[in-house]
Amino acid sequence: MKPTKQILEDILDEVRPLIGQGKVADYIPALACVPNDKLGIAVFTNDGEMLTAGDATECFSIQSISKALSLTLAMELYQPEELWQRVGKEPSGQAFNSLIQLEMEQGVPRNPFINAGAIVISDMLYSRFSAPKHRLLEFVRKLSGNEHIIYDRVVANSEMDHSDRNASIAYLMRSFGNFDNEVMPVLKNYFHACALSMNCVDLARTFGYLANKGIQPGISEPIVTPMQCKQINALMATCGLYDGAGEFAYRVGMPGKSGVGGGIIAIVPGEMTIAVWSPELDPSGNSLAGTKALELLSERIGRSIF
């Protein structure tokens, strides 16, 4: 079955009672004030159709969803052996901002989707781009077709003001020789990436290339190669939802990437991209109602990579 607007609206009605059972991220003050009752979903198909329901056009902080975009840029800039000697490809099983595993493994992060891995990727982008913030924003605007996407400076500054743990991660990696630049400028770029302000429609369209073998619908040139597309999806399937990746694979069965702003992007290779948003999180830092919505959608339309 193909998704329809009615299916999306029915699913949101079913998951709405979950609101109140999760917790909005409060360790970043600018995120703590987001209303907890927001709920939206968008589906973008490879033939260009967009379906929406709920608060699909309301912007929010995409947070760690941006890590998949930063990885995409890094894969364009670096040879595989350069990239993967600095960050791994394995699930961590630890919290996304853990220091313990990082020290045990000599400053090499388990994967690009935990904080340590994304900070290494930011360091690599900082080495190759003269203006990495501008380059990422330009890239996202191109993919989404929305020239009005911006960084939320309030969120970025809030993260910078509460950056002790991420700074500790960066300095620990630097002590092991896995960091090339000054820490604070790299972190500033990292926090701006997390502070991209987008909505479900923007996100679903932006990640269309991952459902289409690396080619963005509506853009003639490939964004990544088919092999790179497969690799990014594989990493999202195994590592994209922190220490809740296994649970998400079991329930939803799609490659996905979440953020503590309450957004989740999910990919149905060859068919469609789905973006969902609900700010309340489960204990792993993933959207509670958003995960349930994707689970129900997977069941209703009969889609899974497994």
Curated annotation (Swiss-Prot):
The name this protein goes by in its record: Glutaminase
Subunit structure and binding partners: Homotetramer.
Its EC number(s): 3.5.1.2
GO terms (BP aspect): glutamate biosynthetic process; glutamine catabolic process
Keywords: Hydrolase
SUPFAM superfamilies: beta-lactamase/transpeptidase-like
Catalytic activity: L-glutamine + H2O = L-glutamate + NH4(+)
Family statement: Belongs to the glutaminase family.
HAMAP family: Glutaminase
GO molecular function: glutaminase activity
Residues that coordinate or bind substrate: S64, N115, E159, N166, Y190, Y242, V260
InterPro entries, sorted: Beta-lactam/transpept-like (IPR012338), Glutaminase (IPR015868)
